[in-house]
């Protein structure tokens, strides 16, 4: 029998290491449903919090707002995304985005993309690069640290 988690009845996890302004709840919906090829996460974004820093990935990402109204920053500027809004963030710099909740009510949203690993994210505002190879193996580095291809060989 297939697992069928209800997105309106999730228990959210919080990471104590998240700084103020980025404290959001996450529920790993696709994992609960037994998915392997697509990663679907549900986020509870409290008022005044932001889901993650402005970034882009090298794979398509999607956002569906289930409840509330978020402000979404993209290369074209900021726009509101309210209940039922579906947004696609294309792979690469054109898909850069940041999802924030400047309002007074929580925002409930789904985000999904492929589950390919490693996953690479670029953070243009902080000149940072992130590489994820599983949930427990993350590398975050400043992008300006040039290393010669053969250094250390």
Residue ranges and their predicted role:
Residues 1-37, 122-153:
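A short, N-terminal "cap"/entry segment at the start of jelly-roll beta-barrel domains
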Residues 24-26, 41-57, 94:
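Conserved short histidine dyad/triad with adjacent acidic residue
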Residues 37, 51, 78:
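Short, mixed charged/polar active-site loops
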Residues 42-46, 55-74, 112-116:
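Short, conserved beta-strand element in jelly-roll/cupin
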Residues 50-52, 71, 86-87, 92-98:
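Histidine-centered metal-chelating micro-motifs
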Residues 62, 75-92:
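Short acidic-glycine-tyrosine-enriched beta hairpin
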Residues 91-119:
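Ligand-binding loop in jelly-roll beta-barrel domains
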